[in-house]
Amino acid sequence: MTTIADLVANGAIVKIDVELAAHEQPSRLLYSTPGFIQWLRHVLDGGRPPACVGEATPAEQIDDLFCSFLSGEPLIFTRQFRVVRAEDNAVWELKTPDVRIFGWFAAKDCFVAVFGNWTDTIKDHDLYRGYRLGIRRLRRELCIDETLCVKGVSPDDVLSA
């Protein structure tokens, strides 16, 4: 049985920490694959979609989303996160106006980010199925079974109130 610690130890995932306000403590966990970190660095270095919808930059949008997630703030279902397809061991999407982040919940309040892309690119090229299948394939390759993947598809299954 693979554990989060095993995945971190073998470099399959890394923990993402974001600086929170002085009065905030992390109440959720956020991990990602090295490939996601590479994409995130591109965004943090100023990468932008062809047309931005949000008032904040994509980097600011991601920072705000990650801070909200890690600090335990309530996330708005369908606006800030949603299940890509209602199925066992579902793939989930974290959302901002300009960015989509795909991954899965390894446990309640513990998200693993695998793919990131611009909202318009995903919608224009209908990339949802490809990301969903890519995440399922990755979990198989890493020998991740149902003990490291939340089965539920409702917000209460993956996030504490």
State the predicted function of each range.
Residues G116:
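Active-site donor-binding loop signature of nucleotide-sugar glycosyltransferases
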Residues F102-A113:
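Active-site beta-strand-loop-beta-strand hairpin of nuclease catalytic cores
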